């Protein structure tokens, strides 16, 4: 189990998880606010 937790804390695994979270966040923001360029404040 110690080796598995060490593997999960390596940079490629952490970076992959971060990219997936970022992509999902951008997709959801664009789903609810499709074109923020048309907002005139």
Swiss-Prot record:
Taxonomy, superkingdom: Eukaryota
Keyword Cell membrane: no
Name of protein: Photosystem I reaction center subunit IX
SUPFAM superfamilies reported in the protein's UniProt record: Subunit IX of photosystem I reaction centre, PsaJ
Listed transmembrane segments: 7-27
GO process annotations (BP): photosynthesis
Protein function: May help in the organization of the PsaE and PsaF subunits.
Family indicated by similarity: Belongs to the PsaJ family.
Membrane-protein topology: Single-pass membrane protein
GO cellular component, one term: photosystem I
Subcellular location: Plastid, Chloroplast thylakoid membrane
Keywords: Chloroplast, Membrane, Photosynthesis, Photosystem I, Plastid, Thylakoid, Transmembrane, Transmembrane helix
The keyword tRNA-binding is assigned to this record: no
InterPro entries xrefs: PSI_PsaJ, PSI_PsaJ_sf
């Amino acid at each position: 189990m110690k080796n598995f937790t060490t593997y999960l804390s390596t940079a490629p695994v952490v970076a992959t998880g971060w990219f997936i979270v970022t992509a999902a966040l951008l997709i959801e923001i664009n789903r609810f606010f499709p074109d923020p360029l048309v907002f005139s404040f």
